[in-house]
């Protein structure tokens, strides 16, 4: 393990403290069973650890007899494109997840192998602060028809931005491309309209009822 030495000054004296550096993984996925058959997974952000955390939560809920799943993306600001694609790989059928296109028309596709498509009712909760990667997740679920979106229209961030370092130590962030849902929809400035609009979707459980 790498170590750093911190020098601390207190009451006119100094002391060196050796600290070991470790990777800290923030919990961005929380899950629980809402009742005997309905599972709930909240994703707060799409980071390097999201896919594995989702996989673990999804597996544990299945072991507990889950027959319907509620994925909560409300207040999720987005995150890494790779993270949302790896997460969707676990539930989508074979096909497009999302594609990006730059100003020259160069297109980059991100697809799903479809080895483990979800086979239970799925509801995705969204609101006006669900953005970027959260909208990629929502758009893919909606376009593939594997789940129902419930909530309010999402933020509407359908662009890809990159940060470029400058010689003086500063940096500039530029829009380099736009992303599109599997059906070719760019949601920049418009967002994704849910299938069921509700400010506080307290009744979302009914949309995952396997008996309906």
Residues covered by each model-derived region:
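Cleft-lining beta-strand/loop regions that shape enzyme active-site pockets
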Residues: 1-157, 161-164
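Short acidic, Pro/Gly- and aromatic-enriched capping/linker segments at domain boundaries
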Residues: 166-177
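Conserved helicase C-terminal RecA-like lobe
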Residues: 189-212
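Short hydrophobic-aromatic micro-motifs
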Residues: 41, 172-174, 187
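Generic structural signal for well-ordered beta-strand positions
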Residues: 15, 187-188
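Short, acidic, Ser/Thr-enriched surface-loop or helix-capping motifs
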Residues: 181
């Amino acid at each position: 393990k790498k170590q750093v030495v911190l020098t601390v000054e207190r009451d006119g004296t100094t002391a060196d403290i050796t600290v070991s550096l470790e990777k800290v993984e923030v919990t961005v996925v929380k899950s629980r069973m809402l009742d005997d058959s309905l599972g709930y997974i909240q994703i707060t952000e799409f980071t390097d650890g999201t896919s594995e955390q989702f996989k673990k939560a999804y597996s544990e809920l299945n072991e507990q007899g889950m027959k319907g799943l509620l994925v909560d993306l409300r207040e999720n600001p987005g995150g890494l494109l790779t993270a949302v694609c790896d997460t969707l790989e676990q539930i989508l059928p074979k096909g497009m997840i999302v594609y990006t296109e730059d100003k020259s028309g160069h297109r980059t596709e991100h697809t799903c192998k479809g080895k483990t498509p979800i086979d239970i009712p799925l509801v995705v909760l969204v609101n006006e602060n669900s953005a970027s990667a959260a909208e990629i997740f929502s758009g893919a679920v909606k376009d593939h028809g594997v789940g129902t979106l419930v909530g309010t229209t999402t933020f509407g961030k359908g662009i890809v931005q990159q940060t470029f370092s400058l010689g003086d130590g500063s940096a500039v962030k530029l829009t380099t491309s736009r992303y599109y849902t599997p059906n070719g929809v760019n949601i920049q400035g418009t967002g994704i309209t849910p299938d069921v609009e509700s400010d506080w979707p307290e009744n979302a459980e009914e949309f995952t009822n396997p008996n309906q």
